Amino acid sequence: MCIRDRPPARSIGEDVGGLYEIWNTEATPFTTKGFEDKADIDIELEPSKGGTKFRYFQINPTPEGVPVEILNEMAADAFDKIKASHCRVDVSKHPAMHKTDSIDYIILLKGDVTLILDEDEIDLKPFDTVVQRGTNHAWRNNGNEPALFIAVLIDSEIDA
């Protein structure tokens, strides 16, 4: 049964990229009854305790010539809007570095992207898959067009 056949009810941050919520679960076990849009809630980066998030997201190319201080302010504002300021634990390698208490399954659908980690950088091409296990990371769009990803985030207890 198809519950919804339309664009996502909520999105945020289109000026720097954007998060587009497809579906959320709040905790397990979850009910399969009802027809309400589980993604029609305020957008937060992390899933709730015991919950999941299914979304696609877009990373726009970094504007040329913008000072790093301004990029840091833009990133801080973007993370604040999605209740994720606490996820920015070490931004020394990139203004959008962040770490969530989740395991994330991510597929790059379109674009030329580098995954930036604390100790490494990995170039990705369309249909490459990344499994994030509570790692501090950021995405750098190396192209001239927005990069598009699809992701499933699952709340997890991350080892320190």
Regions found by a protein language model. Give the residues of each.
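Short, well-structured hydrophobic secondary-structure segments
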Residues: P7-N60
